[in-house]
From Swiss-Prot:
Removed propeptide positions: 19-57
Species the sequence originates in: Hydra vulgaris (Hydra)
Predominant localisation class: secreted
Free-text tissue specificity from the UniProt record: Expressed in entodermal epithelium along the body column.
Similarity comment: family membership: Belongs to the arminin family.
PTM-bearing positions, type Serine amide: S80
Name listed for the protein in its UniProt record: Arminin 3b
Any GO CC annotation of this UniProt entry: extracellular region
Amino acid sequence: MKIVFAILFLTFIALTYARSFEDLKEEIKNEIEKEIFDDLEEESDELDNNVKKFNDAKPWRRWFRWKNIAPLIPVVIAASGKK
């Protein structure tokens, strides 16, 4: 009789542990998903900030390029006119 109670007790513990283990697995899965989504949001915010910086830099870069190219325009026109 003691063996039967021991087996039933161990079965009860195993079932309880199995449910707890499944709950634990689900909780870990939810935490990992939450961390992944948080990281994705942070990366998205960083990308948005980089886009803003890039767009802010565009007028400066255009002016800088024009400043380098503008003195060469008369040379190009003169060279093409001689041909």
